[in-house]
């Protein structure tokens, strides 16, 4: 749903490739846990945003706030870090300010309902926190690159 492109993507790819090549599981773990730590505040802000901005009637805001949010990292040809919300359908649609649901009393008929207050409930916290996450990841990459240079 949200994709953070770190400015040091080439550096991320190079460090990740080197870590795989030398097989240093300790440094890999350090890198991945640093990425998870860096994105944790953004995930928490997205949950708060869901609780505050999505419709409270029917408990939609609480159900979405309980959705699983995880950090995924790619180290192949397109390196990057992605924060993803899963566990419920229509999360992306809700982020665009809409929800699709059956009509009360006629479950066979579905409608698209606008929820303008919900627009950006996920992307806004991601965009707001992206700079801090990038900075933290680049610092971690520098630290790990130095450790790799000393060890190998």
In which residue ranges do the predicted regions lie?
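Short, Lys/Arg-rich flexible segments
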Residues: 1-80, 104-152
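Mid-chain, well-packed structural core segment of small domains
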Residues: 75-103
């Amino acid at each position: 749903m949200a994709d953070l492109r770190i400015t040091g993507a080439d550096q991320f790819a190079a460090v990740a490739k080197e870590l795989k090549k030398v097989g240093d599981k300790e440094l890999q773990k350090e890198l991945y846990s640093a990425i998870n730590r860096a994105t944790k505040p953004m995930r928490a802000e997205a949950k708060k945003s869901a609780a505050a901005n999505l419709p409270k009637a029917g408990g939609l805001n609480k159900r979405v706030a309980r959705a699983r949010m995880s950090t995924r990292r790619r180290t192949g040809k397109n390196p990057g870090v992605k924060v993803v919300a899963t566990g419920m359908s229509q999360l992306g649609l809700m982020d665009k300010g809409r929800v699709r649901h059956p009509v009360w009393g006629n479950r066979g008929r579905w409608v698209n309902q606008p929820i303008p207050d919900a627009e950006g409930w996920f992307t806004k916290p991601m965009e707001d926190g992206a700079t801090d996450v990038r900075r933290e990841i680049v610092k971690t990459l520098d630290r790990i690159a130095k450790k790799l240079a000393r060890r190998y």
